[in-house]
């Protein structure tokens, strides 16, 4: 099983220590709950990963680990085959000892859009909600974060994260917990909170914004990234059963409406800092994610529309502060 003991020891010494009142019991319950059918085999695969520590680690320009001397051809083949057991790899990319995990999403492109607009992360304690396999956690560490905590209930993402961590020399500056935001108490302990690609999956988006606010310290910063539609502050798309083949999409507001939602929840200094159409080069099928991707979800005769006839994915980034 996954051992969270190092994380407990870490937060016992900082301003997250009150989380220990409930977190160990929650994760113990998670360990007993209905796990994914492949979870035990994924954990066994994790145990079979070789112990490797990088002689060069670059988390500033990517998630890039290298070793001198490099892996032999046979070692690379063996490691590649192990990492492929964790497919599909959706968020990345990762470059690990000459093995390039070309993920479905170019999450580095999103990071490049976000980074110029946020407060410096040096020395900060950070929460990333819906963090996927933790790619952005490592980039936060690369920007000097003291501790980057991700939450995501998807068990494959947890195993992918732990695989990468093991190949980064068991780095303890980032941690992923298999929880949803609704399972967190109001910690009020994070300097920065990220919620990227989550809001439109929530049945009650304002409740989600309140939950994010409750995790921040006073004067803490929220980075919110979401699907949006063009329009004024009164515009919101409520799609039918599917949007771009996704079932669980409830509200896609305009960026101006999201700004009003944030202000209604008590955030201040709210700014829309970026808005960009998602290109098929940013989300696509790869050798590490071989099922359908964005190009399959768009109208084949008009790439400005989804296959259901809605506006094609447009994403906005907003920055806000908790007073």
From Swiss-Prot:
Top-level EC class as recorded in UniProt: transferase
Signal peptide: none
CDD domains per UniProt: AdoMet_MTases
Gene3D superfamilies: Vaccinia Virus protein VP39
Catalytic activity: carboxy-S-adenosyl-L-methionine + 5-hydroxyuridine(34) in tRNA = 5-carboxymethoxyuridine(34) in tRNA + S-adenosyl-L-homocysteine + H(+)
GO MF annotation: an example: methyltransferase activity
Residues annotated as binding carboxy-S-adenosyl-L-methionine: 91, 105, 110, 130, 152-154, 181-182, 196, 200, 315
The UniProt record lists the keyword tRNA processing: yes
InterPro entries the record matches: CmoB (IPR010017), Mo5U34_MeTrfas-like (IPR027555), SAM-dependent_MTases_sf (IPR029063)
GO BP term (any one): tRNA wobble uridine modification
EC identifiers of the protein: 2.5.1.-
Keywords: Transferase, tRNA processing
Function of the molecule: Catalyzes carboxymethyl transfer from carboxy-S-adenosyl-L-methionine (Cx-SAM) to 5-hydroxyuridine (ho5U) to form 5-carboxymethoxyuridine (cmo5U) at position 34 in tRNAs.
Family: Belongs to the class I-like SAM-binding methyltransferase superfamily. CmoB family.
Complexes and interactors: Homotetramer.
Name this polypeptide is given: tRNA U34 carboxymethyltransferase
Originating organism: Photorhabdus laumondii subsp. laumondii (strain DSM 15139 / CIP 105565 / TT01)
